C-alpha cells in the first residue's frame, strides 16, 4: 500500500519531490498552478521533463497526481466563465500529462441552482473536449485520466452523490476516459 499527500510544488514542481520524501510519502499530489488563479503557470519543457525523470528515478517510482485549480466550473451557465474553465482544464491536463501524472483530480463545478440535469451534457462534453485538446483522447486518458472528485454536496455542486458521478461518467460516453 502506498501513502501520500498533497504537497506544495512551488514554481518549478521539483520541490514537491523533496517534500514528499521528507514526510515519507511514496505517492504525491500537486497543483499544476495556483489553485485560485485562472492563469496557468508557464513551465519550461526542461522543467517538466526534469520532474518526470526525477519521479521515474525515485526508488519504487513516485506516482504523481495533479489537482486542477478550484476555479474551474464546467457547469457554469456564464459563457465567459465556462470558456475560462475549459481552457484552464485543458492547460492543467497538459501539464499533468507532460510530467507523467497518473491522473488529474477535478471538482466539476456548480450548476448554481439550475439543477444537475440542466448541466449534465455540458459538463460531460467539456471533459471529453479537454482530453481531445491535449491529444488523442484515448491516449491521454490511458496515461492521465481526469479523476472527478466527489464534493461535500453543498449548494449546487456537481458530483455530490454516487448517482450524479455515475450519470456524468455515462454521459461522457467512454468510461475509460474519465474516472471517479
Task: Give the location of each predicted region.
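N-terminal pre-domain/capping segments
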Residues: 1-68, 72, 76-91
Amino acid at each position: 500500500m502506498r501513502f501520500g499527500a498533497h504537497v506544495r510544488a512551488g514554481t518549478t514542481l521539483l520541490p514537491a519531490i523533496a517534500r514528499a520524501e521528507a514526510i515519507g510519502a511514496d505517492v504525491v499530489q500537486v497543483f499544476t498552478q495556483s489553485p485560485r488563479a485562472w492563469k496557468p503557470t508557464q513551465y519550461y519543457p526542461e522543467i517538466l521533463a526534469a520532474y518526470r525523470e526525477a519521479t521515474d528515478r525515485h526508488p519504487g517510482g513516485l506516482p504523481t497526481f495533479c489537482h486542477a485549480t478550484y476555479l474551474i466550473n464546467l457547469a457554469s451557465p456564464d459563457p465567459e466563465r465556462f470558456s475560462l474553465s475549459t481552457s484552464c482544464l485543458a492547460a492543467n491536463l497538459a501539464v499533468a500529462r507532460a510530467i507523467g501524472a497518473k491522473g488529474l483530480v477535478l471538482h466539476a463545478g456548480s450548476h448554481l441552482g439550475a439543477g444537475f440535469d440542466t448541466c449534465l451534457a455540458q459538463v460531460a462534453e467539456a471533459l471529453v473536449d479537454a482530453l481531445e485538446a491535449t491529444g488523442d483522447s484515448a491516449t491521454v486518458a490511458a496515461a492521465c485520466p481526469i479523476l472527478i472528485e466527489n464534493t461535500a454536496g453543498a449548494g449546487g455542486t456537481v458530483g455530490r452523490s454516487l448517482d450524479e458521478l455515475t450519470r456524468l461518467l455515462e454521459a461522457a460516453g467512454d468510461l475509460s476516459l474519465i474516472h471517479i
